[in-house]
């Protein structure tokens, strides 16, 4: 197998596997602390998390494609401009999602079926998620950018750091 392929794919596979474990870790901590109602609440709120992550991943993937394209054409100035614009878009999107979802969260949670104690817990969980929305957009988006500039190991490290922070914050907040 091609050494370059392994160098880039193995860290990406590890990072994607760890990203998939975020929900499992949330479920373990919250399930132990809040029981079935807590698990129901994070499942109700999950589309909010998915939307924030998708926004970051989409921006980062688009930026990484443009960056790689300009680098391939030896247009360094344009490539650098794409990186700057992508970072600005992360910032704008993270703040916009915080504001819009913050305003709409109660309606969304009701639309998703939350009632009673599940609504209350889902609202609390969503507030925490929204407070970190800017970091989540940047965190999800920087991964494809790092991969496109040949830093797939750094992308994996960013994912691992995010997972450790996630475990630490959830552990402190819910145990």
PLM-predicted stretches and their roles:
Residues 1-9, 67-134, 172-174:
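Short alpha-helical transmembrane segments in multi-pass integral membrane proteins
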Residues 30-50, 117-121:
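Interfacial/gating helices of multi-pass transporter permease domains
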Residues 101, 154-173:
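Alpha-helical transmembrane segments of multi-pass membrane transporters
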